[in-house]
């Protein structure tokens, strides 16, 4: 299986499976002399790790990261940074009854048809467990960007819609997001979401979500025309996350309903200060950052592993039914928030380094 590497100048390769002994990544292209310790990575992994609330999978993983290379005396050396996270709480026996069956909506069918073999234990490589390695890589990108761009730089993500219940993003509050188990930016939605998701969990079903990621303190000029557009790479990054089925940049699909006057973000200058009257472009024009807040949202489909009995086939081409036991997220979108933040950080650093190489 190829295509496990993401990025150009700053790139990472992830490895490992859901029920294997460990997973991890190798980060290449990180600048030297950046202060980095395991705790810098751990704090991001702790946002994503399972078993932290009744609203996520009850699989218990500490997700303790170890830095194996690329850091000396607390600083990056410019050489590849290798990271490892050991798996602890696997229950492969939960999948014994379905090892020959394809879960509807999951990658089981396509993996088997393409490769002729698949790891049925927790989905193997197609499991959202793989995203722990991305979050680790994103934590390194975040450290570099904070060093290069300063205190104004920030990437923050939130769940803005849980199933059929959306929140008012005009009430977005960064401080609220990390104080609730949903990464919800609007405290008024918390009780509604709690009841909604508990009912879904009790029924044995699942729901989808919409996640929004915002990046602030980004300079003008990141990205390049045509085949290296910043929004193109951000969209690719978000679409690579497990279960993501759609991405919007700025107004996204809604921009098709706007008039030219409504959609255009008018610009004015007051002294040395540039002002945009709106941000339908999501902080990117012509594939290049405008200096505004970059706003990206993506839709995550409902978790495919559910208790409800469904029709399917087995690997021998026979009709059968399936009901998936085990421990699964009733909404995988919740834990996708730190993954989206990580991928945003990786893309931004990649383009920052490419821009420095070409234009500095």
UniProtKB/Swiss-Prot annotation:
GO MF annotation, one: chorismate synthase activity
Pfam families, alphabetized: Chorismate_synt
Entry EC no(s): 4.2.3.5
Pathway: Metabolic intermediate biosynthesis; chorismate biosynthesis; chorismate from D-erythrose 4-phosphate and phosphoenolpyruvate: step 7/7
Cofactor(s), names only, from the UniProt record: FMNH2
InterPro entries associated with the record: Chorismate_synth, Chorismate_synth_AroC_sf, Chorismate_synthase_CS
Cofactor note text: Reduced FMN (FMNH(2)).
Binding residue positions for FMN: 125-127, 242-243, 286, 301-305, 327
UniProt key word Acetylation: no
Reactions catalysed according to its record: 5-O-(1-carboxyvinyl)-3-phosphoshikimate = chorismate + phosphate
Keywords: Amino-acid biosynthesis, Aromatic amino acid biosynthesis, FAD, Flavoprotein, FMN, Lyase, NADP
PROSITE patterns (UniProt xref): CHORISMATE_SYNTHASE_1 (PS00787), CHORISMATE_SYNTHASE_2 (PS00788), CHORISMATE_SYNTHASE_3 (PS00789)
Superkingdom per UniProt: Bacteria
Positions that bind NADP(+): 48
GO biological process: amino acid biosynthetic process; aromatic amino acid family biosynthetic process; chorismate biosynthetic process
Keyword Lyase attached: yes
The protein's role, per its UniProt record: This reaction introduces a second double bond into the aromatic ring system.
Family of this protein: Belongs to the chorismate synthase family.
Assembly behavior: Homotetramer.
Protein name: Chorismate synthase
Lineage per the UniProt record: Bacteria, Pseudomonadati, Pseudomonadota, Alphaproteobacteria, Candidatus Pelagibacterales
Gene: aroC
